[in-house]
Amino acid sequence: QNIHIYINKGDHGYTPNFENALRNAHGDYIFLSDQDDIWMPDKVEACMKYLKVNDFVVSDALIVDGNNKPLFDSFCEQRKSKFGFLNTLIRFSYLGCCFAFRRKVLSKALPFPKNHILCTHDNWLALVSTAFYKSAFIPLPLIRYRRYGGNASSGAKNANKSILFMIHYRLYLLFHLIGRCLVAK
């Protein structure tokens, strides 16, 4: 009764699939998830506590291998993550599967910019949320994030991007963020 299956009839790939899912989400609060990650038992409760006073939250993650054996206690420590709009723009270092947010975030986030190579769902949602909404970091690992070769969004493939690509990527996102400022929703 509460589970609905929606077929993505548009573009395919992980970013368009997340966009399709978000367009069809009906709840007041939205939690992103990857198919192979494990939520900690207190994830929903911890996020909802923060969402009482924030519109967007991102938590830390325990990094595990494909057999669920711990590799690192903190994704954010491993990546040297810093929260906030400018820090996010300079160095994208959060996992979309650690996001939870109020529905109103979608009013600025959707539709996603069309160039999915230059705009992944998690980076776009983090930028929109930290630019336009009250956002917070939860310093607790609320998921067990599996890191192995089969990840669809493995950070390893972005490690070899040129500096020119990284500048182009950020300018593309800034251009679309400015567009969201100019459009009344």
Predicted regions and their residues:
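Glycine-rich, basic loop-to-helix element that forms the pyrophosphate-binding segment
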Residues: 8-25
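Conserved nucleotide-sugar donor-binding catalytic segment
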Residues: 23, 84-156
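Short aromatic/hydrophobic "clamp" motif used to bind/position activated sugar donors
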Residues: 30
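The conserved acidic donor/metal-binding loop of glycosyltransferases
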Residues: 34-38, 60
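Conserved donor NDP-sugar-binding/catalytic core segment of glycosyltransferases
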Residues: 44-71
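Acceptor/aglycone-binding surface of glycosyltransferases and processive sugar-polymer synthases
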Residues: 65-96
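Catalytic core of nucleotide-sugar-dependent glycosyltransferases
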Residues: 78-88, 144-149, 154-185
